[in-house]
């Protein structure tokens, strides 16, 4: 565990952001809705992949600590990378991953008091189902109401990939659902998936839940999900994940150029 603790102590994480955009275009442009924040550890010889790092941490009971650390670090870096953008077009929404069990911790309550960005600009993505069966529907409902009162929104990630995702959806009643990339990939070649997605998107629309198609990489995928009324899209077709340090440099350069224009 020393390697995980050391990574946190020395902030050995690269923070990236990826755009989430409106699927319906206005003037041939997909308007920006927000960003998902991704924190990738700078891997040494101990781990071969980011997934292995986080799996190792979870197996040693460090998911909650890592959640709090990476959310705080990511939001701080995101805030600092978007100061110029915020002054011009308002604060974009920022999506961060969190385990449900973390939301029931004292550490989360402490962070919530002093979030680096306004709570109304934060969307919490329940990215895994760890701890879901530990709590009653009543406990989860109370927690979701507390988050709503604080101004935060909730998304359920990887929806459509089995019972656990649908179980989470039924308990949480989220503001957003994120359609798993495996359902998005090459959907224009699969009539069965097309019919299923159309029915699900129509259902979520009736429930006033916004939908985000993840992992969009092709124009045909954009066209299909736009046609069936999906609210937002995310993926390499729109933007590859961008280090926030690079975003900061780009925004500062644009600001300097505008002053000299």
Task: Please state what every model-predicted region is.
Residues 90, 118, 150, 206-207:
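Helix C-cap/helix->beta junction micro-motif
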Residues 2-12, 18, 40-45, 126-133, ...:
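EAL-family c-di-GMP phosphodiesterase catalytic domain
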Residues 90, 118-120, 173, 229:
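Short loop/turn motifs at secondary-structure junctions
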Residues 110, 121, 258-261:
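Regulatory sensory/coupling modules that transmit signals to nucleotide-handling catalytic cores
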Residues 79-82, 103-116, 133-143, 165-176:
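Distinct, well-ordered alpha-helical segments
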Residues 107-114, 139-149, 199-202, 224-227:
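Alpha-helical scaffolding segments of alpha/beta enzyme cores, especially the outer helices
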Residues 67, 136, 140, 193:
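Short, conserved glycine- and acidic-residue-centered signature motifs
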Residues 1-117:
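Bacterial c-di-GMP phosphodiesterase EAL domain
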């Amino acid at each position: 565990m020393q390697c995980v603790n050391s990574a946190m102590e020395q902030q050995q994480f690269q923070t990236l952001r990826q755009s989430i955009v409106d699927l319906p275009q206005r003037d041939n442009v997909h308007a920006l809705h927000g960003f998902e924040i991704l924190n990738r550890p700078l891997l040494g010889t101990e781990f071969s992949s980011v997934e292995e790092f986080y799996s190792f941490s979870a197996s040693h009971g460090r998911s909650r600590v890592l959640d709090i650390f990476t959310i705080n670090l990511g939001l701080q870096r995101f805030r600092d990378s978007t100061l110029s953008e915020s002054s011009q077009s308002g604060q974009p929404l920022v999506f961060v991953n969190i385990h449900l069990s973390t939301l029931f911790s004292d550490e989360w309550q402490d962070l919530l008091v002093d979030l680096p960005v306004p709570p109304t600009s934060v969307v919490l993505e329940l990215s895994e189902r760890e701890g879901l069966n530990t709590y009653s529907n009543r406990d989860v409902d109370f927690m979701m109401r507390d988050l709503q009162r604080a101004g935060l929104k909730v998304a359920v990630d990887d929806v459509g990939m089995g019972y656990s995702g649908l179980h989470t959806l039924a308990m949480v009643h989220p503001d957003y659902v994120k359609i798993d990339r495996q359902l998005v990939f090459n959907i224009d070649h699969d009539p069965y998936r097309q019919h299923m997605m159309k029915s699900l998107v129509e259902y979520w629309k009736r429930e006033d839940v916004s939908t985000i198609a993840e992992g969009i990489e092709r124009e045909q995928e954009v066209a299909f999900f736009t046609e069936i009324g999906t609210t937002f899209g995310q993926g390499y077709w729109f933007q590859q994940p961008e280090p926030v340090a690079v975003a900061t440099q780009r925004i500062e350069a644009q600001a300097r150029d505008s002053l000299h224009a």
